């Protein structure tokens, strides 16, 4: 008998670390994107909680009139927010070490940039982590493609829009009422309701909700009963079972007769792809719309587009919306300027027709 001795292969610490990071056997998959995702999201979350509770007022408009957003300064859950960085900072990168002191950094709204930039890095890494885990499990990549829609939307309102407007003070505040304020001001300045891409986004979100409700109710109504009348139908399903849990033929026949034949899918895979595609494309288009309006390519303007034979304006809903927009714009940053830009930017009126003679 011959005995063969082989030298044991030594595995370096780095190789063991790589194996642990990319292992799909972990209860929570980490992945290389996770190495960036976990610290950035933890940083953003920690700073957000602290700032929402205790951040001092921020000079958002850059006119030495601080706005309080935290709970300890008199706000509640509805009115509280992390106030965007000061207009005095503009679009400049403003980390802690760029300020003369922590007090100055807080006064100028530094936490907003810290939270937003770490959050965007974190959600982008989460999207990459979805692709990475799908790749390691041999799955198709559609999960990360679908998640790219909310990532694009967040990037549009937190990064692209401030860049286009020239200041992080124009970004969306991190709070409930601040979000509503952002929406009203956005409508006032860009007429987003009349932008085709926003219309597509509304169709995507509401259409996706409708299709989801229709699909869920159809499936629930056509479940194959595996239990008695005294038990919940949910007990008739076993996780991982191979047979269908609902009768797609019955659901197809019902919906085809309710609407018309070709309104109903007869292919389960095509149906679920459509359910994913519709809202994702809608949110993609909305993010594109916000990103173009960031550079003032605004919604359609049909103001005073209907006149009578005498040239007098016949008001339409477009004119009523325009009047509402002007009212909202007047209320926005009311101490930073006297008039909205639409009212202040008229034709230049000459004050002096000739230059005065100066006798020296």
Curated annotation (Swiss-Prot):
Alphabetized SUPFAM superfamilies for the sequence: Bacterial photosystem II reaction centre, L and M subunits
Binding residues annotated for chlorophyll a PD1, in chain numbering: 198
Site residues by UniProt (Cleavage): 344-345
Top EC class for this record: oxidoreductase
Binding of [CaMn4O5] cluster, residues: 170, 189, 332-333, 342, 344
Catalysed reactions, semicolon-separated: 2 a plastoquinone + 4 hnu + 2 H2O = 2 a plastoquinol + O2
Keyword Nucleotide-binding annotated: no
Keyword 4Fe-4S: no
Binding-site list for Fe cation: 215, 272
Xref: CDD domains: Photosystem-II_D1
GO aspect biological process, one term: photosynthetic electron transport in photosystem II
PTM entry text: Tyr-161 forms a radical intermediate that is referred to as redox-active TyrZ, YZ or Y-Z. C-terminally processed by CTPA; processing is essential to allow assembly of the oxygen-evolving complex and thus photosynthetic growth.
Signal peptide (residue range): none
Primary residence: plastid
Site features described as Stabilizes free radical intermediate, chain residue numbers: 190
GO cellular component: chloroplast thylakoid membrane; photosystem II
Site (Tyrosine radical intermediate): 161
MF terms in GO: chlorophyll binding; electron transporter, transferring electrons within the cyclic electron transport pathway of photosynthesis activity; iron ion binding; oxidoreductase activity, acting on diphenols and related substances as donors, oxygen as acceptor
Residues the entry annotates as binding pheophytin a: 126
A Pfam family the protein falls into: Photo_RC
Family affiliation: Belongs to the reaction center PufL/M/PsbA/D family.
UniProt cross-references to HAMAP family, sorted A to Z: PSII_PsbA_D1
More details: 2 of the reaction center chlorophylls (ChlD1 and ChlD2) are entirely coordinated by water. Herbicides such as atrazine, BNT, diuron or ioxynil bind in the Q(B) binding site and block subsequent electron transfer.
Record PANTHER family: PHOTOSYSTEM II D2 PROTEIN (PTHR33149:SF12), PHOTOSYSTEM II PROTEIN D1 (PTHR33149)
Entry function: Photosystem II (PSII) is a light-driven water:plastoquinone oxidoreductase that uses light energy to abstract electrons from H(2)O, generating O(2) and a proton gradient subsequently used for ATP formation. It consists of a core antenna complex that captures photons, and an electron transfer chain that converts photonic excitation into a charge separation. The D1/D2 (PsbA/PsbD) reaction center heterodimer binds P680, the primary electron donor of PSII as well as several subsequent electron acceptors.
Identification of the protein by name: Photosystem II protein D1
Gene: psbA
